[in-house]
């Protein structure tokens, strides 16, 4: 008993210390995060393990877990990286309603030792709830007698969001009668009223439909609408009104009882009983009117009641009253004058004989169609009959004898306009009132083939994707023939012609009856971009008539050609290239360039390059240009970098779907001392010819400048002597200038002209030499310019064709077809206007010309101003005036001669993998270097010969 009492305080003290320690741990582990509501699953909330000071490796052994009393499934922790993320949808309005603060409280528990951390995740409100009105339509009833400034309260909208997202503003559709009075507050609407602006008129507008819109203050704002239907109640403020104040009618004396004399109609714009009208004779009423006529109080019809007698009373004057049924009735009045007419009781008779129907539409005018006779049993003026015909018809009546008429064609017929005529012959006697009789004649018009089939438009444009299945329907032509029956039966056929070396019928066919055009074989955009032909439509008339329509079928390109890597040069195998580079290079050093071409066009041939990082790792110090294919370093290399790198370059076009190709680049890192040896051997064969080429160009430029200076001095001396010399006998006149030579490089150009002088007296012929004209077009090459005869000025403006012995190098041809040059490349297309040739522009994606690769020479039919420097596929960046390109070619330079004299089996390195590092020289390049030196000597000799010719 004593021992248990002595050991009691110690466990209590231990328990107390544990509670204090747990409370201290709990307080020190409080974390706060925030996340927007409606965040997607996996949204990052915070690095909870790092913030709690826990290592990632101890999360699993220490049983790291998250618990929540009410919302345990909203947030979760990834035990691999210690990140707290959104596990399920979080709706702030569902969690906290309209509370200003909304948080999710979590408890993080770890064992060994036991630790408890409190985490508070604040849920931020987003504008995800639009304003909502209690109802989508609200009806309001307003009497038209309500005065202006009357207010009609409205129910405001509510927004489940908080703060600015729930601040509502209202707007009403513009109108002339109502305006909106709204007092805004940040949280809710205090009052919302509809105010009447001016007096209403139900007779003008019976119902107003307005749209009330509520907008919250979120970004972007959300809106809610309610349609206000305002019905105007009627007030009896309008009296019935007749259309006329006085009506005049006539009635025959032999009219039967109940004969309608007139139907009076009064209108009241009021509604309901206020607009119901009762008709009556206005008092006092004469006994004669009461005896002869009666009035219907509901519809205003006045009918005969007793027998009328023209000899006893010829005219009745009746006063009629119209009264509405409003609480305070209002009345309208009019006067009716009824005239009684004498009777002509015998009508004429009409007889039609000798019809010639139907008639052809090509019948000539004045042809007789029918004979008509009329008669009337009355005598005097009541028996005198006149005939008339339906107006506005191509027929007329011609009186041939007393009471006899002929129906004659008056003008040309057109069955396509009117196929039949319903003629009405009216015979009227001379009685008072006159009696008449009518007879109908149906005249049919027979068709004549006078209309050719007509298409809706003279030309149709059709777009067909390439690789279509054979026999697919691409278009339907339809021609309409205004004729009838066989004359309108249309058949279709192709207008045969040759398309290249093949007949048109081998490409397309047309169905004779339906006009459907079919493609007989798959079309290829790369071979045929436009197919233009004609379809003929003919009717079945005698003789047949026809017309043609032109179809322009454009073959649309599809992405059916994958990018193709250009064949690598020596030292490469397949799509793989090896390269040595020193470790001492800095960031941005270009190592190698990958090139590819795509046979498609447009976006289908626009190529982009990217490294496949998954194959080589994510920390390589290299990157590739998206559109250039240049592989360069991203940072300086250090010792920890691997000595060998294998890069996979993915070449992808922009078609749908995109097609790809893969190139492999093997890079080996060497020390700085080893790089120059490999570099000197690798660049000896490639740089040497280019350096020699630049030296020769410099010499040529110096020589040309010296010769030009000498010519200028000679010209000045000649002019001075000419001016000081006495005039020669005879008359001399300048002849037409002849262009000797003109050349351009970049924005600099020079030219020469000869102007022979034609003299009529004694003295030698002289020639004026004009040099360095900056605005003349280029002439032909030096071999053709010296022996050319004098031409007219018009001949100088004609474009020159390129020399047949000039051609592009392999790299330049590849650049012309690369992704960057798709729109700038010169492509020969056989279009409607004939083939035209464009030369490619120089872009940043094309490297500077290597040995044996030059720009097109001046005089080869190319305007040097069209060679512009471009940076990527965007807008061209033109060189400024007075700027010279880094390298340009002078006509007759060794570069051109080397190209013209290059043998067919030349093994000059034209690798399309252009490397900028330094690699070892192979045995083939050593042999090639010796051959190039011999070739350069020959080219220098040829260059001297060409310069002397110029």
From Swiss-Prot:
Protein topology in the membrane: Single-pass type I membrane protein
PXXP repeat start-end pairs: 734-737, 774-777, 799-802, 832-835, 873-876, 891-894
Biased composition (Basic and acidic residues): 787-800, 909-923
Domain Cadherin, first and last residues per copy: 34-133, 134-242, 243-350, 351-455, 456-565, 581-678
Glycosylated residues in this chain: 257, 265, 548
Transmembrane segments: 698-718
Annotated spans, 6 X 4 AA repeats of P-X-X-P: 734-894
Region (Disordered) residue spans: 774-808, 827-950
Signal peptide positions (record): 1-29
Localisation per UniProt entry: Cell membrane
GO cellular component term of the entry, any: plasma membrane
InterPro entries: Cadherin-like_dom, Cadherin-like_sf, Cadherin_CBD, Cadherin_CS, Cadherin_N, Protocadherin/Cadherin-CA
Superkingdom field: Eukaryota
GO MF entries: calcium ion binding
Membrane side Cytoplasmic: residue ranges: 719-950
Ranges per topology, Extracellular: 30-697
Protein name per UniProt: Protocadherin alpha-13
Source species: Pan troglodytes
